[in-house]
Every structure is written in C-alpha cells, then in structure tokens.
C-alpha cells in the first residue's frame, strides 16, 4: 500500500543509546535514509529549568509559525539551483570514494577499520547541505568550507566502523574530516 503524503514531508526522529533496554540497531539501508544526524547535548541547568517551567505549568505553551510549507518548498527548490564548481564536486566524489574499504588505494585506516563507507545517497546529502549552507550565508556558490561544514552531520551515521575499529575507539567524525581535508587540499585549483 502506498500513501501519498502532503509536501513538504519530513520526519524528525530521536535515537536512544544502544545500551538502553529495547533499543535495536537499524539496518544500514535505513540509517542511510536519514539526511542528518544532529547530536544534541544534555540541557544546561538553566535550560532544564526553562523546559520544566514551560512543560509542567498550567499554561500551555504553543509554538508560533514562522515559515509556511510553501516557503520550505521554495527554499528546497532554491537550494537545488545553487551551482557547484567542478573542483568542489570532484572533491566530494573523491572523498566519498576514499571511505570505501574495498578500494586498495584508499588509506590503510579505511581498509582496516571501516565496515561500510559512504553511499551515493550520503554524497547527495553533503551536496544539498553544502548548497543550503551557502544560501544561508548569502552566497550562491558552494565553497569547500560549506562542504566541510556538512560532512559530519550528513555522514557521521553513515560511515560504519567494523568491530576492530569500534574496539580501538576510532572517532568516526575525526576520520571523516581527515579524509575530506585530504581530498579538499588535492582539489584546490
């Protein structure tokens, strides 16, 4: 059965730590469908007080609409219109390929510690996020800095370490940035 959802449609989800009872790992194919993984720190004491005030009192707090669905659709279309220079696109393609453990020329750390590299869907997420960041910064062109900004939130959940990499405590975010930086340096015209 297929149900057509009204546009724009997107889902925000939370991920509980695997250590919690009743929590199961998602298959890689499902993980890859999440555009971003944003890590939210535990609220500060003052923020926690605000949360308690706004959620446990008699007065019901409601949000205020600041953007319409049509605004979101227009922004999504505008993001897709942002051009990306060939050297930036090449850096992304080379970076994504550098995460594949099956490639003999890739760094030893990738071949030894990575179970699953970045998929084409991950590369698409990086491009779209970098384009959005450029627009939000008032520019109609994507820089390597925009791409670097997008790498961790768009890919931290997609690069899967193997057992050995996890056991040795490798940091996925650091690995992603190191791999991207190497390709970005090589791509500068």
What are these regions (language model features)?
Residues 55-58, 79, 95-99, 154, ...:
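Alpha-helix boundary/capping residues
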Residues 1-82, 131-133:
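Canonical AAA+ ATPase core
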Residues 62-123:
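Conserved AAA+ ATPase small/helical "lid" subdomain
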Residues 101-189:
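C-terminal engagement/docking regions of AAA+ P-loop ATPases
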Residues 51-52, 92, 150-155:
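Short alpha-helical scaffolding segments that buttress acidic/His motifs in well-ordered protein cores
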């Amino acid at each position: 059965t297929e149900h057509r959802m009204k546009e724009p449609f997107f889902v925000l989800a939370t991920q509980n730590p695997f250590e919690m009872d009743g929590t199961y790992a998602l298959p890689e194919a499902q993980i890859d469908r999440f555009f971003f993984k944003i890590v939210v720190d535990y609220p500060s004491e003052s923020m926690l007080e605000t949360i308690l005030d706004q959620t446990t009192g008699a007065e019901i707090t409601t949000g205020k609409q600041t953007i319409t669905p049509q605004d979101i659709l227009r922004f999504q279309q505008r993001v897709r219109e942002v051009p990306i220079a060939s050297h930036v696109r090449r850096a992304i393609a080379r970076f994504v390929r550098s995460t594949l453990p099956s490639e003999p020329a890739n760094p030893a750390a990738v071949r030894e510690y990575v179970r699953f590299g970045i998929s084409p869907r991950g590369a698409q997420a990086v491009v779209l996020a970098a384009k959005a960041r450029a627009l939000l910064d008032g520019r109609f062109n994507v820089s390597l800095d925009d791409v670097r900004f997008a790498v961790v939130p768009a890919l931290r959940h997609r690069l899967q370490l193997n057992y050995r990499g996890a056991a040795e405590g490798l940091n996925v975010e650091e690995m992603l940035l190191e791999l991207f930086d190497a390709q970005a340096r090589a791509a500068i015209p």
